[in-house]
Amino acid sequence: MSIRHGLLALLDQGPRYGYQLRTEFEARTGATWPLNVGQVYTTLARLERDGLVVPAGEDDEGHQFYAVTDAGRAELHAWFDSPVPRTNPPRDELAIKLAMAVTVPGVDVPAVVQSQRRHSIKALQDYTRLKGRALAGETRPTATGGTAATYDGTGADLAWLLVLEQLIFQTEAEVRWLDHCETRLAQRAEIEQARAAENRQNDPAPAPAPRRIGRRRTTA
């Protein structure tokens, strides 16, 4: 529940209203997982229902601020102290697609793998380019489409770099997995060809059709 706890982490630094939370969440993650304001306020309503945040007044413009409670702070610290569970991994669309493709007749599975590899390699190149620009001190994109201050290796910039590097490592692993899938597919094709050849050898040859022998006609 990263959004829920991400908002608690921001509120632990002081009261904020919905749009501020959205902007700061996206700034710290490099807008990798964009949020809409409605999603933020829906999450805040659930946090308030669970006693983890409380309304903290409004400003002159009518923005409703929220503050974290002691219970919310305790849940946040428990989240930081606990490993992310991997026993129930989130759904992965690519894994589901390939699992279905290999079981549905008529799907060109190698073509699916090759298409995904091209896309993943392009994404990997883009992520690597962004990392190079950040480390070179260039500006980085923001959630609103503008640019942030130059990367200085601290605060939100460091948070964004960590997220970016996670995407790089994740995409590298995905490309390696796609290579592995292609190897598996080639092995399966070889096994199927060997079985087909064996079946042809084991099939008994069809018996020759009996030759029809007619009686010789005699003439008087």
Question: Which residues make up each language-model segment?
Answer:
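Residues in soluble alpha-helical coiled-coils and helical-bundle/repeat scaffolds
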Residues: D12, R16, G30, P85, ...
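Amphipathic alpha-helical dimerization/coiled-coil segments
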Residues: A78-A134
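Charged, low-complexity intrinsically disordered regulatory/assembly segments
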Residues: V113, L130-A220
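Conserved beta-strand segments that form the floor/walls of ligand-binding pockets within enzyme
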Residues: A67, K97-A99, V163
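Structural signal for well-ordered, non-membrane alpha-helices
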Residues: E48, R73, I121-T128, E172, ...
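Short amphipathic alpha-helical/adjacent loop interface patches that line ligand
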Residues: F25, L44, R117, L124, ...
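Basic helix-turn-helix/winged-helix DNA-binding cores
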Residues: M1-E93
